[in-house]
């Protein structure tokens, strides 16, 4: 890349801050309680539902089989499968407390299509945003939820971005609204890897990115 006169927007260390979920320690008060080893789940939580995933990826479209666990016993079975998964296993399997989110519909495999949004940031400045679930069938509830997201959700995401902008320049904040009306961080992603999900206009996104980087589009 350097030989081409270019540079990475995020360094390897900055990428690892996202990929290893080091961000969790900076945002633990605004996201789901998370345990990086299943054995660390406290006994007080072992009768409750958990969500299992890799540090970066998940099998969310196999929700009932490989992500949602009704209790610790079910989580242990799913963890075995995920540890043997070629994509998830090398990342390390984590467990998160299941918090019911505002849900618009479900897929055939049980995946909840929730009130979740993706926001891109560069150096703490908001670039673009859109609804997270590009595969939703009925957009009506999304449009009903949009005003509250743009008023409350974006303000919440901006606050989150301000807290971690010194750690990584280009990143995505995925946020969702719980059934009780609270906004939470679902996860962070490296902006160089995160998809536009069919809900963020590519031309507008790359124009904004180019402007903020001070570099013309090739």
Where are these regions (language model features)?
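Residues in and immediately flanking transmembrane alpha helices
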Residues: 66, 131, 200-203
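Residue-identity detector for glutamine
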Residues: 2, 16, 65, 91, ...
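C-terminal active-site "lid" helix and adjoining low-complexity regulatory extension at the edge
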Residues: 151, 166-168, 177-218
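Short, surface-exposed, polar/charged, turn-prone segments marking secondary-structure boundaries
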Residues: 9-11, 35-38, 78-81, 121-124, ...
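Phosphate-binding core of ATP-grasp and ATP-grasp-like enzymes
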Residues: 56, 100-138, 158-171, 179-182, ...
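Active-site nucleotide/adenylate-binding loops and adjacent lid/helix of ATP-dependent enzymes
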Residues: 1-115, 133-136, 142-158
